[in-house]
Swiss-Prot record:
The lineage of its organism: Eukaryota, Metazoa, Chordata, Craniata, Vertebrata. This is Death-associated protein kinase 3. Changing residue 112 to M: In a colorectal adenocarcinoma sample; somatic mutation; greatly reduces kinase activity, increases cell proliferation and cell survival. Its EC number is 2.7.11.1. It comes from Homo sapiens (Human). Belongs to the protein kinase superfamily. CAMK Ser/Thr protein kinase family. DAP kinase subfamily. Pyridone 6 binds at residues 94, 96. Keywords: Activator, Apoptosis, ATP-binding, Centromere, Chromatin regulator, Chromosome, Cytoplasm, Cytoskeleton, Kinase, Nucleotide-binding, Nucleus, Phosphoprotein, Serine/threonine-protein kinase, Transcription, Transcription regulation, Transferase, Translation regulation, Tumor suppressor.
Length: 454
């Protein structure tokens, strides 16, 4: 956030007469106490609350100040100092005391294209400087084209009021609806991306008025004016342009182009044959020592235009109605965008529902197949289980039979074992008998042998 001098401006400057006022600003003449030099003090009413529409926001004030701090050009007003108090930010600006260019020209009996273009060239030079710094003024109109001093042979143009000027950043799309309806470009009316080209349209309108005293798009109402601008509804009425050169008309045509990309740039405008031809004619006239032939334009209609413009300034050229209109357009654009977003969301939701339905149907078919397969598997398992249970019962019966058989075998084995033991005892007894018999026989045999020997 920029910081300004938190001092009372009247400690440094003596305030004088009011020079002009706008919706949220008052400009007063002032004199610096130390030097006696005269300046213009622009009191900008600060917005107290962000939700309020009274006053200028801090962001807007800082934007204007930052732009003024950056620019230094003979045809652009200069910022000298800045003060701030509780209610206002005060810009101390170069004093531009020569009045409006159109008022100055309207005081003349007649005007030549050459004279008009000398001033136009200064306007182009100032805008060229701004555009070289990517600064768009966005409010070029007769009231903001002033003379530093009209009481000199060659008055100097000064472009003033940078309240809605913007720095155009590459890659950052900028849209807004502001400016003075009579001079705004179609892209502003239609809420389209804005750039330096909008200033060139305004220069086209200013040139048209300068040469004819008529406004190309001005209607009975603001809505009619904006409709004419959007439709690029204008022509070169012979009543107003009978003394205007074709080159001048071509210059205007190349600026009043709806497509910003096809509109003449500031560099191209400075190289346009109409601007360069006047310079060449002036040089030839100086070399030959005679004045070049000049087309003279009546200033009667320009007088009428300036009188009408000043008298209708409060109701017709104030920003209030146009701002309300712009708010309506912004809200309508936001509503349309919201509707488009809702339609996109509805379409996406419908697509999601269809996708989910397709997934559900696919899953349902898969579950159905799986269910059928599982049913078959369950039936097969049930059959296997029944078989297993039957085999189990058979095995149990066989085991029971085997147990019964084992008990019988045990009893039979026991009986056989008993019989075996009895037989073993009997055999043992008989074996002892035989052994005793054999021993007895052997003794008898021995006894017989002994008897024979004797």
């Amino acid at each position: 956030m920029s910081t300004f001098r938190q001092e009372d401006v009247e400690d440094h400057y003596e305030m004088g007469e009011e020079l002009g006022s706008g919706q949220f600003a008052i400009v007063r003449k002032c004199r610096q106490k130390g030097t006696g030099k005269e300046y213009a003090a622009k009191f900008i009413k600060k917005r107290r609350l962000s939700s309020s529409r009274r006053g200028v926001s801090r962001e807007e004030i800082e934007r204007e100040v930052n732009i003024l701090r950056e620019i230094r050009h003979p045809n652009i007003i200069t910022l000298h100092d800045i003060f701030e108090n509780k209610t206002d930010v005060v810009l101390i600006l170069e004093l531009v005391s020569g009045g409006e260019l159109f008022d100055f020209l309207a005081e003349k009996e007649s005007l030549t294209e050459d004279e008009a273009t000398q001033f136009l060239k200064q306007i182009l030079d100032g805008v060229h400087y701004l555009h070289s710094k990517r600064i768009a003024h966005f409010d070029l109109k007769p009231e903001n084209i002033m003379l530093l001093d009209k009481n000199v042979p060659n008055p100097r143009i000064k472009l003033i009021d940078f309240g809605i000027a913007h720095k155009i950043e590459a890659g950052n799309e900028f849209k807004n609806i502001f400016g003075t309806p009579e001079f705004v470009a179609p892209e502003i009316v239609n809420y389209e991306p804005l750039g330096l080209e909008a200033d060139m349209w305004s220069i086209g309108v200013i040139t048209y008025i300068l040469l004819s005293g008529a406004s190309p798009f001005l209607g009975e109402t603001k809505q009619e004016t904006l409709t004419n601008i959007s439709a690029v509804n204008y022509d070169f009425d012979e009543e107003y342009f009978s003394n205007t050169s074709e080159l001048a008309k071509d210059f205007i045509r190349r600026l009043l182009v709806k497509d910003p990309k096809r509109r003449m740039t500031i560099a191209q405008s400075l190289e346009h044959s109409w601007i360069k031809a006047i310079r060449r004619r002036n040089v030839r006239g100086e070399d030959s020592g005679r004045k070049p032939e000049r087309r003279r334009l009546k200033t009667t209609r320009l007088k009428e235009y300036t009188i009408k413009s000043h008298s209708s300034l409060p109701p017709n050229n104030s920003y209030a109605d146009f701002e309300r209109f712009s708010k309506v357009l912004e809200e309508a654009a936001a509503a349309e965008e919201g509707l488009r977003e809702l339609q996109r969301s509805r379409r996406l939701c419908h697509e999601d529902v269809e996708a989910l339905a397709a997934i559900y149907e696919e899953k349902e078919a898969w579950y159905r197949e799986e269910s059928d397969s599982l049913g078959q598997d369950l039936r097969r398992l049930r059959q296997e289980l029944l078989k297993t249970e039957a085999l189990k019962r058979q095995a149990q019966e066989e085991a029971k039979g085997a147990l019964l058989g084992t008990s019988g075998l045990k009893r039979r084995f026991s009986r056989l074992e008993n019989r075996y033991e009895a037989l073993a005892k009997q055999v043992a007894s008989e074996m002892r008998f035989v052994q005793d018999l054999v021993r007895a026989l052997e003794q008898e045999k021995l006894q017989g042998v002994e008897c024979g020997l004797r």
